[in-house]
């Protein structure tokens, strides 16, 4: 039996929706916006109400201008100061709190990247609310879905906090359109520098390959490769596929590759069109980071390897024979 909502209930629901407002904290590198921010904006629009974006940095005019064109954003707030170099959470938190106080946002969110995971717990603590991490769906303005038990179960969380603070899994939401928007831009609230931490420098690994979390094709290697030198087999294959290269935690812990290549529950979450797992057994922690891939190909000489349970295609063979053969075939095409 269906029961119609009373007119009064509908009016109250509509009134609540009008008062919803969300602040998205933009992650960027001054001259370019991190792709996960566009996914976070899409999630924010699902909440209803007005969506604003806060951009803090040293020379972030270009990012602010780009955000004004993104569909779904009503306002872009810009804060430029030397203390925001490196986007340190100690400096960003007072800025976010001042912005929230000025506009009375009901929701504050960022992508579930290293940036968001570092920043939002501090913001939530200062607001005296409990944060919700790594959401994959939004059911209503106060109800969210996230994974638990390494992705083997879904947990629906109802949040009654005065301000909802949450991080968004980028692979669970489409990227917002980068055109069609007409947001206004204005200066954000000014705050005094905290200066308890200082940004010194960062050294980034340069690569001509796509960034791991945004690549359409990912080739990942595990302990089965036996050494870091053997990862060259994957690099050669990836070059033919214009793919990013990842690794399991076992390969990272063994010192084969740096930890920024790790895919899994404690690494990066990816959902490419094609994921090729080479010499990876398929531990539950690794599956949590890649099982949303559209097509999964597994190469392993052990037919009982758990990776085959989630793979769309499996090759039971010696990777040291199969991978070079695949590379040679692709070179001829």
UniProtKB/Swiss-Prot annotation:
It is found in: Mitochondrion matrix. Keywords: Acetylation, Disease variant, Electron transport, FAD, Flavoprotein, Glutaricaciduria, Mitochondrion, Phosphoprotein, Transit peptide, Transport. InterPro entries: DHS-like_NAD/FAD-binding_dom, ETF_a/b_N, ETF_a/FixB, ETF_alpha_N, ETF_asu_C, ETF_asu_C_CS, Rossmann-like_a/b/a_fold. The modification N6-succinyllysine is found at residues 59, 69, 85, 158, 187, 203, 216, 226, 232, 301. One of its GO terms (molecular function) is electron transfer activity. Residues 1-19 form a transit peptide. GO terms for cellular component: electron transfer flavoprotein complex; mitochondrial matrix; mitochondrion. The N-terminus is blocked. The modification Phosphoserine is found at residue 140. Residues 205-333 are annotated as: Domain II. The modification Phosphothreonine is found at residue 93. Its main location: mitochondrion. Gene3D superfamilies: HUPs (3.40.50.620), TPP-binding domain (3.40.50.1220). Transmembrane segments: none annotated. Its cofactor is FAD. Binds 1 FAD per dimer. One of its GO terms (biological process) is respiratory electron transport chain. Residues 20-204 are annotated as: Domain I. FAD binds at residues 223, 248, 263-266, 281-286, 300, 318-319. Belongs to the ETF alpha-subunit/FixB family. Heterodimeric electron transfer flavoprotein that accepts electrons from several mitochondrial dehydrogenases, including acyl-CoA dehydrogenases, glutaryl-CoA and sarcosine dehydrogenase. It transfers the electrons to the main mitochondrial respiratory chain via ETF-ubiquinone oxidoreductase (ETF dehydrogenase). Required for normal mitochondrial fatty acid oxidation and normal amino acid metabolism. It is linked to Glutaric aciduria 2A: An autosomal recessively inherited disorder of fatty acid, amino acid, and choline metabolism. It is characterized by multiple acyl-CoA dehydrogenase deficiencies resulting in large excretion not only of glutaric acid, but also of lactic, ethylmalonic, butyric, isobutyric, 2-methyl-butyric, and isovaleric acids. PANTHER family: ELECTRON TRANSFER FLAVOPROTEIN ALPHA (PTHR43153), ELECTRON TRANSFER FLAVOPROTEIN SUBUNIT ALPHA, MITOCHONDRIAL (PTHR43153:SF1). Domain I shares an identical polypeptide fold with the beta subunit ETFB though there is no sequence similarity. Heterodimer composed of ETFA and ETFB. Identified in a complex that contains ETFA, ETFB and ETFRF1. Interaction with ETFRF1 promotes dissociation of the bound FAD and loss of electron transfer activity. Interacts with TASOR. This is Electron transfer flavoprotein subunit alpha, mitochondrial. It comes from Homo sapiens.
């Amino acid at each position: 039996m269906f029961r119609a909502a009373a007119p009064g209930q509908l009016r109250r629901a509509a009134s609540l929706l009008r008062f919803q407002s969300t602040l998205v904290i933009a992650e960027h590198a001054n001259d370019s916006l991190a792709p996960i921010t566009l996914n976070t904006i899409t999630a924010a629009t699902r909440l209803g109400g007005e969506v604003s974006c806060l951009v803090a940095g040293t020379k972030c005019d270009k990012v602010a201008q780009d955000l004004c064109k993104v569909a779904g954003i009503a306002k872009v707030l810009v804060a430029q100061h030397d203390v925001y170099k490196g986007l340190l959470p100690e400096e960003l938190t007072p800025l976010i709190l001042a912005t929230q106080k000025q506009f009375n946002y009901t929701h504050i969110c960022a992508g579930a990247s290293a940036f968001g995971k570092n920043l939002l717990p501090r913001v939530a603590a200062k607001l005296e609310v409990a944060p919700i991490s790594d959401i994959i769906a939004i059911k209503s303005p106060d109800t969210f879905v996230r994974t638990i038990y390494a992705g083997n179960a879904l947990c629906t969380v109802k949040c009654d906090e005065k301000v909802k603070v949450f991080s968004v899994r980028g692979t669970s939401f489409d990227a917002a359109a980068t055109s069609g928007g007409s947001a206004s831009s204005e200066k954000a609230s000014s705050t005094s520098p905290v200066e308890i931490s200082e940004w010194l420098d960062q050294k980034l690994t340069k690569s001509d390959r796509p960034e791991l979390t945004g690549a359409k094709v990912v080739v990942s290697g595990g302990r089965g490769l036996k050494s870091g030198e053997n990862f060259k087999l994957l690099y050669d294959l990836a070059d033919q596929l214009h793919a990013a290269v990842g690794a399991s935690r076992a390969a990272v812990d063994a010192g084969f590759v740096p930890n920024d290549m790790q895919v899994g529950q404690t690494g990066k979450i990816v959902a490419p069109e094609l994921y090729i797992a080479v010499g990876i057994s398929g531990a539950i922690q690794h599956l949590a980071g890649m099982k949303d891939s559209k097509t999964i190909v597994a190469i392993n000489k052990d037919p009982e390897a758990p990776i085959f349970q989630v793979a769309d295609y499996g090759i039971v063979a010696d990777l040291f024979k199969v991978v070079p053969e695949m590379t040679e075939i692709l070179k001829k095409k």
